[in-house]
Each structure stands twice: as C-alpha cells, then as structure tokens.
Amino acid sequence: MQFSLSIATAILAATASAMPVLETRQTVGTTANEFTSGGCKDVVLLYARGTTQAGNMGQEPGPELGNALKARLGAARVAVQGVAYSASLLGNLNPGGAPANEATSFRTLIGQVASQCPNARIVVSGYSQGAALVHRAVEGATAAVRARIAAGVTFGDTQKQQDGGRIPGLDASKTLIICNTGDRVCEGTLIITAAHSGYGARAGEAVDFIAARV
C-alpha cells in the first residue's frame, strides 16, 4: 500500500507539472470597483447602471460592455468602475432625467480620474437612467475634464431626444448613442417596452466605437 501510494503521488505531481498554466480571467459582474480599489489603467471605463439594477454595473449591458472592452484591449489595460447612485424609479422624474446631486457625484468621479490618471483614456457610459446621468455629469464638467473624455457611449438613452441626439459638452465624434428599434425611452417618453432590454447584445458595437478612440 505504501509503495502504491508513493507511485500515485509521483504520477499526480508529474501530471500537475505538465499541465499548462491558465491565465486568471478578470470578469466584470454586477459590481466593479477597479479604479477605486486598483487605481489607474490605460483606459478607465466609468459606467452608470439603469433604474433599479443591482450593484453599480447592473445586470446588462454594463458587464457585457466591461468584459468585451477587456477582451478587445487586454484586461491589464482596462479599469472598469461602476458609478454609485440610487438608480431609483423617481430619479427619472428629475429635470434632465437624473438627480442633480448624483450627477454631481459622477462628475466628481470623472474629475478624480482625470486628475489622478493623467495618461488614462476616460470612457463614460450608461444605460437608461444611467445614460441620463452621463449627460448631466458631462455637461457640467469643466472644459479641461471634458477634453480628457475619449468616448461617451449610452444605451437606451432617456435623454436622446431631449438633448438632440448628443451628450451636451462632448464632441459628436466622441459620442455614440445606441437605441434599439422601438425603444420608446429614446423617443422622449418613459414608456418601457421589450425593446428597452437586450442591450447586452450590442456591447460589441460600443466596443468597436471605443477601441477606435482610445
């Protein structure tokens, strides 16, 4: 028995040493704090989730966007940071589609990244009410901070029509607003239909746009 156990141990050790070492994959879930906990990367994605979604990234399309961007550019180059805000139903009823104080907090976060990471390319993004938060945060930022934003991408944007298909203060060449056909919130209403979901499938479209600008 002792002899057999020794042989088995040796075989297991040899097999383990011959196995390839798998690279640990960093996956983005419903919560991501890679800037606040890990600092600067070449690209910092700041993302605001939709109304009532979980964590600070939501169920979709935030995680899909973060993971697709890491896959395209390399996980070591990208820090994904969710935006902490209430994402309440009533938040949508505020002027501009989002609470002013929470837009200010998002704006402060953008400024923090710009200050602490002078070489980083900043990307701002959001879904639904989170898209409105992007609009309100960017429009109130200083010109110097806005100049640091490489791309702004929104999904199911509740402020698309109100703001003329743009993010105020951000150059049109840096802006992509993704809206599904039939998504009524992109038409200036708060009527939720099936078309307001499924934006995770369009993360690749967003990444193509971002990658060309960072």
Curated annotation (Swiss-Prot):
Catalyzes the hydrolysis of complex carboxylic polyesters found in the cell wall of plants. Degrades cutin, a macromolecule that forms the structure of the plant cuticle. Required for efficient penetration of the host plant cuticle by the appressorium during the initial stage of fungal infection. Keywords: Disulfide bond, Hydrolase, Secreted, Serine esterase, Signal, Virulence. Its main location: secreted. One of its GO terms (cellular component) is extracellular region. Gene3D superfamilies: alpha/beta hydrolase (3.40.50.1820). This is Cutinase CUT2. It comes from the Eukaryota. Pfam families: Cutinase. GO terms for biological process: appressorium-mediated entry into host; carbohydrate catabolic process. The active site is at 128 (nucleophile), 183, 196 (proton donor/acceptor).
